[in-house]
């Protein structure tokens, strides 16, 4: 049963964080918000993991890339 919910467990429907909180603009300078959508290795998390809608995922990706370019966020995290 690869890919299915675990024995009797029901998956919770993911809700878009931005829609639920009424956020209409994602600012590239708000690094604390952007860090919520980046993996521990520094990669942008996909929609299927975060539950973000397509519209806000595009805005989020653009904001993260701008933030990286301005050196507010790292491109990759260092190994320890």
UniProtKB/Swiss-Prot annotation:
Coiled coil: none
A single BP term in Gene Ontology: translation
Pfam family, one: Ribosomal_S18
GO cellular component: cytosolic small ribosomal subunit
Molecular functions (GO terms): small ribosomal subunit rRNA binding; structural constituent of ribosome
Superkingdom: Bacteria
Assigned keywords, A-Z: Ribonucleoprotein, Ribosomal protein, RNA-binding, rRNA-binding
Family: Belongs to the bacterial ribosomal protein bS18 family.
Functional summary from the UniProt entry: Binds as a heterodimer with protein bS6 to the central domain of the 16S rRNA, where it helps stabilize the platform of the 30S subunit.
Subunit structure: Part of the 30S ribosomal subunit. Forms a tight heterodimer with protein bS6.
The protein's name in its UniProt record: Small ribosomal subunit protein bS18
Organism: Staphylococcus saprophyticus subsp. saprophyticus (strain ATCC 15305 / DSM 20229 / NCIMB 8711 / NCTC 7292 / S-41)
Gene (UniProt): rpsR
